[in-house]
Amino acid sequence: MQTLELLAPAKNLECGIAAIDHGADAVYIGAPRFGARAAAGNSLEDIRQLCDYAHQFGAKVHVTVNTIIYQDEMLDTLKMIQQLDEIGVDALLLQDMGVLTEVRAQNLWSRELHSSTQCDVRTPEKAYWLTTLGFKRIVLARELSLDEIKAIHQAIPDREIEVFVHGALCVSYSGVCYASEKCFGRSANRGECAQFCRMKFDLLDSNGQEIEHQRYLLSLKDLCQLDHLKDLADAGATSFKIEGRLKDINYVKNVVAAYSSQLDAIVKAEPRKYRRASVGHVQYNFTPNLKKTFNRGFTHYFLNGRQPDIASFDTPKAIGEFVGKVKEIRGNISFNVATVASFKNGDGLCFINDDRELEGFRVNRVEGNRLYPFGMPEHMRPGMALYRNNDRAFEALLARKSAERKIYIVIEMEPVMGNKFREEPQGVKAVVNIMKTKEADGGLIYQVAEVFKELKLEKAKRPQGENIKAQMSKLGDTIYEAYQVELLKGMETYFVPNSILTAIRRELIDELTKANQKQLDKSLWGGWDRTLFNNGFGFSQPGEHRLTKEEFTWQPEYGKWGYLYNIANYDARVFYQIHGLSPVVPAFELGKNIPSAWNAKTQEEYDENIEKNKANRSMQPKFTNERGESLLMQCRHCIRYSLGYCVKRGGKKPSWREPLFLQLGDGRRFRLEFACNECQMNLYSEK
């Protein structure tokens, strides 16, 4: 049976709890430091509370420590990881191989390790190599197709595969984007991305002739694979990840609810093939609608091969749902909309004007299809498409208690008879069973706890079945809901005072909670001794799985640009040397003026030169080719294809000459290279 996990983002404790309540099987949250979203750090205490809450439902908490780590940060990083292990975190996401080396060598982590999407996994070979290093789960690049995902699954059939299914898309393969660091001194590999890909560019040819003027040529639509979850599961994916660790709580509620409902439908259709990774059913107080939550328009990206409409060239902002067209404008006061949608005071609307710019405004008053904005938009024209990017009524629904998650239980009660010399009942036995799902087929009912209450039972004057069931179903504010109360062996014929029934119910729930915690403790440790983690869990020893230079060249660019391996500390340098990489080049963030620390032969010598290393990090990176350029991005998105000029795929022949350049408003230019054999677009900085 295949387990399906919905993995949701948690900006903070509140968002994490909301994700669990709305159906997530796991959440991922930023560590106090060193996560790939520097603005999304959380305290250890908040993470501990989130673990306690999630574990009640068998849900998991993953913590991201997925940046590259400088040597002077290593001790703090390892100490934090050990603390995360102690508070019950279920999985750790890593990018830095130096951190991996120390975690394994010092036995600092007792549970799952996941390779971050920052590891840039595009091929079966790289996925397999990472599993030999100790990673139980591989997070794949967002750009992969179903066939590519299937090929990776076939290479690592006994390991978990995590795929992104919803949210913002990075235009470059994750982990190998250096544009933000180059242009603004803010490294994406350090969680400080400056959103270079959401900026305006001119597109110029080799003669400086303008092809496109001030458009968002690197800005992609948002990913949405809601209708392809089963396809992904059939390809081998087991975890479905929602992007958005900086998104607000209403975003989390709506998106998680939509995807959880879809996964439930898949499980219900084939209960003997699929099951959810956690327990509990959710009652929603709203109907999920992805169009009503922040989005730039949706795309399936490359799931079924290259598609023409993946970019959002007009705006990087949220557009929202289409609600109609402007029909008629009355001066500077109001306008009429041709629509079947209804509006509320305070709705946020927007449109793309004649200059292909997004304009937005707030509705002040509504009279049917006639809207009175706070200020009439200057560039609105009849016939323009209108979008709603803030639905006040929907947001109000989400602001209230919008869902409740409960675990179905089945309670069985029966009288306990005496021995053959004493036929009268000696008390009541109550047993509680947890249901994985409420469907009869594949419901996975299993016994959890039981209670015996010794008391003298007397026959009731009238049937007690309804009263006993009602009393035992009063589970109040607990996380449990009585799906069924079964009375066995004539239990309904005996009288039991309500006070006794209440006591039995409370004791039963207490025992259930204890049993769940005991089972949780066992599952968290996974049944292995932590000393086995380093050398007995099927992972290679340091240097055991050496690669040749050709094997280390995951893509052609890796053979030309050594900084793509993101080696930022002494441990990572030694790791790659032991595993056969040569030459070993420091991370882009360290710059080409290699500090003496980088050339150290021992860690002690390295540590002595840390201050020089710090000083070097303040300098501009200087890794360049013979043209004085640096490779900043590798993209499957292709501007030439999106504009209709890909001759390989039937596009028109361009009238301009290559190379093409993207140019920022301040004059900085970036050369585009179209690597058609790889079907990839690379972006280079100029001198």
Residue ranges and their predicted role:
Residues 78-128:
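Well-ordered mid-protein domain cores that form the structural environment of catalytic cofactors
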Residues 39-43:
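An active-site metal/cofactor-coordinating segment within enzyme catalytic domains
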Residues 1-22, 26-36, 46, 50-51, ...:
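Surface-exposed amphipathic alpha-helical tracts and adjacent flexible/coil segments at the periphery
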